[in-house]
């Protein structure tokens, strides 16, 4: 007898002897546990009943179209069962309404039903539940499905297991591989997860999909028939499955298919218990197997009750499954890591670097097989993947959804999808330089519209699909049409790395580039026509911020913005020096960054000279190193245009203040750089400029050396004179400027923006009224003069939730969608649902009065209001009415919320 029970601190000595004390205390704990378990069971059963009735009432079926001709569903039942959504009569009605006399059902579960329900077109496969199917059966079912689809273009296959997850998914994935849609398991699994989430494929399932790929490869692999001897199994480190979490008591089972042929399980006392200190588990087997082999290891447990009943329980540690025909002939050791093992569901029970090792040996002679495998003498080269679809567009969309590029676009390497494995898919027999791309440009080129012919596109070999109805292996093996180019192209010199820096002299036809950021901003502010495309005889700048876009997308790789604008040193024209603080000779004195967005004046811009130089060497050592990034927000010369903001620069003849030569004018560096000097004067003027305003008074920065000034100011250079200009001078006559050091011209940071009409007592109200208007359109005065509105029209959904609602509204019943919007954020919250029920009731309902949250504080109030709501929306009162189904859905939501309210103890609101 264990002494721990007698010495337990919760036992009182007044209860008597040790045995009766233990029985009494144990009985109390037993009934307490029984009460808790019974309560949880009833709660779970009640919730499952409600969910089942809800789903049945709403007409939901567990029914998924993986393709238009492959359907997956869960098990159909003849009777109502808890937790099952598919009733056989509903499924038959649905299939007969859409695919009458053109569907066949494949039952993969060991459970059966009356096949007459589906017009006796049911194939019983009886696959095991927690294992992968045998390779023989998997291949045979795929071949049967293909033959059925081949008979009539309207035929469809309906696949189901118990839950419509793992077994159904491996069959559909194998069917994709069988029809040459995919040549690797990865895209097939991704497509299955996209179409039916939560399929739960185990590593053994994926392994068998790989076997199907080997059987259906260009050079198909044929499994051998040599028996395999498993000498021993080694597990390291020792997993933690006992109560102390320091070891386990393992035994091993070996199965061929579903038949157990060997086990090491013995009497509990005779079995060895392994501890963490042992380091590994070693179990000798010496069993010979052939075909589909399953190796499972269990932990044997024994409790006091099981000892009295002479029973033991077990917990599965892991399971692995493989086919002996795919093991290489010289293999002696098979290693499986934790991601390659099945049934490893509790990660904390497995130490790091957990692995299983099988010591094996292949026999030299083949075993005579009773049945010929279905893959023998079966040619799959004529199998067309288009048989899985009803249209070519569906075929293309499925390839994209599975993570593989469509057949008319060069795909990535399937082994390293999405990681730039592009050059491995090129057909090097066709030496066209137009098909040489940078890896970083591949993703951008795929998304652009291409003007190439089909023959040019076929020069990029695709390992997965076929095009234009050719044979399915035309994509795997290049045909004559792929090897012979449509028209020989002259050899061209391509600078892949951009080391030479010179533009290609030959002009190529390139697809129209989408508008860049600078073009969009240029059109927005009225200066879109300033820049034109770079001619073929000139050296253009391949800048992503340039309005004309890159010069070519096929002949030369696209340079990044960093390589064109952020060079460490800049080459300046001959004899020219660069002063970053001096004013340039352009007509607009403050156009520091506008030259990056205007190509019309690029010939005289010292900033663009280094990017046009074919040599990366520096020719002006006296030039300081400047790092300039193109600014897509616009130039600084927006004040020179009478219409407001302008992106491009004007010529020297349009401004009386600019110089006509290209040499930069040097000026003294200003002593004060105060960009906030005019912040206090923004309240009294509008940003919209007037056409009749004199030069420099258009609501912006005045040009340098403006004729409006009486004399040059010693402290008003470059930035400060334009930045400190008083904006309110646009409303008064021009005045001669005073020296910058005078107190009248200094910036005032204490201005309170009190330019409001009315007296001192009325200003608070006026400010409150104007605040809302300013928030509604803060920049309306800027854009109103240019023909734009400050209010952005909402033409589409702006959030993910709105986009999801928009998609649901296309397919879902409007009444159901309204119910979902009602319960959003209020799931099973009885108070929230009752207080908002008036928003979801049907038209014409006048009995229900809106209830506030203040009337739902106590449980009694909630109960009273809930009963009133039930009387209003009860389905029995809506029998025969057009809103009967709608009332039933409202009633179900209220019923679920009330059940949750009762389960939580009917707590008051506060």
From Swiss-Prot:
Compartments, as annotated in UniProt: Cytoplasmic vesicle, Clathrin-coated vesicle
Pfam families (UniProt xref): PTEN_C2
UniProt repeat feature Sequence, residue ranges: 33-36, 37-40, 41-44
Residues covered by region (3 X 4 AA approximate tandem repeats): 33-44
A Gene Ontology BP annotation from the UniProt entry: synaptic vesicle recycling
Cellular component GO terms held in the UniProt record: clathrin-coated vesicle; intracellular membrane-bounded organelle; postsynaptic density; presynapse; vesicle
Record note on modification: The N-terminus is blocked. Phosphorylation at Ser-567 modulates its ability to bind CLTC and therefore the synaptic vesicle endocytosis (SVE).
Record's protein name: Auxilin
Gene (UniProt): DNAJC6
């Amino acid at each position: 007898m264990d002494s721990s029970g007698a010495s337990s601190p919760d036992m009182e000595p007044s209860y008597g002897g040790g045995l009766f004390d233990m029985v009494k205390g144990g009985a109390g704990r037993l009934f307490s546990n029984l009460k808790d378990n019974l309560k949880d069971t009833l709660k779970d059963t009640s919730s499952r009943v409600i969910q089942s009735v809800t789903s049945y009432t709403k007409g939901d079926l567990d029914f998924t179209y993986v393709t238009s001709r492959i359907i997956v569903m869960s098990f159909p039942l003849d009777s109502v069962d808890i937790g099952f959504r598919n009733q056989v009569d509903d499924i038959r009605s649905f299939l007969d309404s859409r695919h009458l006399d053109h569907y066949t059902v494949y039952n993969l579960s060991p459970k059966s039903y009356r096949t007459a329900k589906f017009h006796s077109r049911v194939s019983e496969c009886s696959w095991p539940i927690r294992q992968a199917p045998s390779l023989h059966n998997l291949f045979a079912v795929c071949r049967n499905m293909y033959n059925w689809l081949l008979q009539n273009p309207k035929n469809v296959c309906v696949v189901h297991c118990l839950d419509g997850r793992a077994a159904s998914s491996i069959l559909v994935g194998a069917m994709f591989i069988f029809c040459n849609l995919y040549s690797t398991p990865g895209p097939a699994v991704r497509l299955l997860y996209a179409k039916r989430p939560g399929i739960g494929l185990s590593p053994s399932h994926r392994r068998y999909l790989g076997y199907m790929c080997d059987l259906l490869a260009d050079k198909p692999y044929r499994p051998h028939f040599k028996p395999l001897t498993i000498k021993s199994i080694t597990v390291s480190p020792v997993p933690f499955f006992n109560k102390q979490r320091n070891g386990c008591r393992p035994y091993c089972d070996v199965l061929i298919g579903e038949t157990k042929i060997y086990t090491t399980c013995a009497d509990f006392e005779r079995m060895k218990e392994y501890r963490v200190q042992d380091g590994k588990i070693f179990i000798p087997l010496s069993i010979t197997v052939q075909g589909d082999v399953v190796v499972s290891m269990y932990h044997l447990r024994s409790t006091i009750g099981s000892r009295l009943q002479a029973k033991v329980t077990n917990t599965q540690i892991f399971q692995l499954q493989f086919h002996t025909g795919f093991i290489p002939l010289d293999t002696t050791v098979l290693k499986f890591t934790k991601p390659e093992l099945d049934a490893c569901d509790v990660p904390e029970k497995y130490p790091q670097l957990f692995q299983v090792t099988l010591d094996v040996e292949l026999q030299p002679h083949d075993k005579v097989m009773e049945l010929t495998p279905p893959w023998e003498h079966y040619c799959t080269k004529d199998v067309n993947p288009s048989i899985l679809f009803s249209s070519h567009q569906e075929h293309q969309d499925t390839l994209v959804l599975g993570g593989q590029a469509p057949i008319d676009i060069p795909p990535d390497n399937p082994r390293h999808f999405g990681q730039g494995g592009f050059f491995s898919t090129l057909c090097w027999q066709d030496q066209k330089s137009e098909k040489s791309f940078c890896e970083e440009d591949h993703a951008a080129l795929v998304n652009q519209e291409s003007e190439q012919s089909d023959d040019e596109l076929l020069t990029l070999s695709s390992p997965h699909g076929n095009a234009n109805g050719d044979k399915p292996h035309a994509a795997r093996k290049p045909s004559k049409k792929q090897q012979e180019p449509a028209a020989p192209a002259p050899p061209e010199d391509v600078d892949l790395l951009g080391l030479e820096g010179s533009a290609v002299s030959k002009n190529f036809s390139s697809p129209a580039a989408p508008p860049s950021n600078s073009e969009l901003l240029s059109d927005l502010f009225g200066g879109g026509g300033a820049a034109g495309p770079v001619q073929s005889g000139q050296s253009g700048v391949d800048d992503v911020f340039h309005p004309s876009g890159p010069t070519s997308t096929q002949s030369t790789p696209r340079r990044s913005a960093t390589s064109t604008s952020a060079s460490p040193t800049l080459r300046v024209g001959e004899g020219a020096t660069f002063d970053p603080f001096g004013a340039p000779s352009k007509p607009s004195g403050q156009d520091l960054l506008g030259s990056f967005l205007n190509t019309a004046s690029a010939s005289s811009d010292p900033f663009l000279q280094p990017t046009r130089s074919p040599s990366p060497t520096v020719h002006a050592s006296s030039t300081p190193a400047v790092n300039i990034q193109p600014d897509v927000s616009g130039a600084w010369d927006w004040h020179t245009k009478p219409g407001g903001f302008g992106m491009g620069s004007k010529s020297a003849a349009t401004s009386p203040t600019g110089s006509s030569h290209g040499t930069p004018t040097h000026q003294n560096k200003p002593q004060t750089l105060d960009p906030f000097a005019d912040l206090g004067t923004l309240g009294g003027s509008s940003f919209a400029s007037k056409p009749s305003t004199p030069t420099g008074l258009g609501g912006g920065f005045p040009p340098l050396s403006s004729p409006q000034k009486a004399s040059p100011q010693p402290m008003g250079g470059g930035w400060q004179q334009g930045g400190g200009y008083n904006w309110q001078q646009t409303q008064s006559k021009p005045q001669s400027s005073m020296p910058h050091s005078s107190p009248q011209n200094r910036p005032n940071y204490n201005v309170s923006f009190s330019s409001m009409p009315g007296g001192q007592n009325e200003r608070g109200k006026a400010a409150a009224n104007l605040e809302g208007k300013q928030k509604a359109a803060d920049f309306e005065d800027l854009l109103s003069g240019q023909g734009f509105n400050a209010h952005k029209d909402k033409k589409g959904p702006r959030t993910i939730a709105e986009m999801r609602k928009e998609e649901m509204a296309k397919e879902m019943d409007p009444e159901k969608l309204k119910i979902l919007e009602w319960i959003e954020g209020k799931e099973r919250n009885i108070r929230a649902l009752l207080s908002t029920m008036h928003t979801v009731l049907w038209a014409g309902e006048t009995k229900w009065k809106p209830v506030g949250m203040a009337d739902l504080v106590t449980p009694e109030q909630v109960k009273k209001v809930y009963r009133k709501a039930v009387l209003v929306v009860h389905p029995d009162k809506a029998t025969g009415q057009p809103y009967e189904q709608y009332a039933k859905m409202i009633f179900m939501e209220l019923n679920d919320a009330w059940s949750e309210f009762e389960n939580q103890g009917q707590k008051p609101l506060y």
